[in-house]
């Protein structure tokens, strides 16, 4: 049974991919208000045309000032958000360690930069929510790095470290306020996301119905 997200507002950061489409559909079915942020206006228009009842925001999530402005627009139009699913990503690699170029790394690190900006901009929202959720997609390669994917795995490892720091911040804020923990930061690991988009979407929706204290600072392997 799908957990009801009526009254919840969720931001999909970089949500124009297949994973973003699957997540948007699942969230809408569950009753959430969905906002998709991305930098490609054509992809946003196609997504809106296919799903209709969601909001889209054109934004370069790797630009700190642009994300600050995005947060202002979202708050003005929708109020605080209850969830953020970070889907900015991609793969570049191969060629062993010698093939790990700076050019590839700069492209890959955009995902981590976007996560830093978005998670900071909406941190107060998630902490204030009765069920705040931040979720990122990482890789099983973090547990077993390979030379040909060193750039990619380094970015994913940084993503996990940042997400765990967010989790600690959620726990500390609740403890300092003398309140139960209601926000959770979650890491979803995949070997490859292709074919797991629906499962990712379902797991993210289900996370809103799970106990935050149990869920916060956890790694969920979707490849098993």
Please provide the spans of the model-predicted regions.
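Rossmann-fold cofactor-recognition segment
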Residues: 50-65
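Catalytic loop of short-chain dehydrogenase/reductase
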Residues: 96-116, 127-181, 189-191
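Conserved glycine-rich Rossmann-like NAD(P)H-binding loop of the short-chain dehydrogenase/reductase
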Residues: 30-46
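Conserved Rossmann-fold cofactor-binding substructure of NAD(P)-dependent oxidoreductases
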Residues: 62-77
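Flexible N-terminal pre-Rossmann segment of NAD(P)-dependent oxidoreductases
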Residues: 1-12, 212-213
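Conserved glycine-rich cofactor-binding loop
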Residues: 16-17
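C-terminal helical subdomain
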Residues: 172-224
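Conserved NAD(P)H cofactor-binding loop of Rossmann-fold oxidoreductase domains
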Residues: 85-94
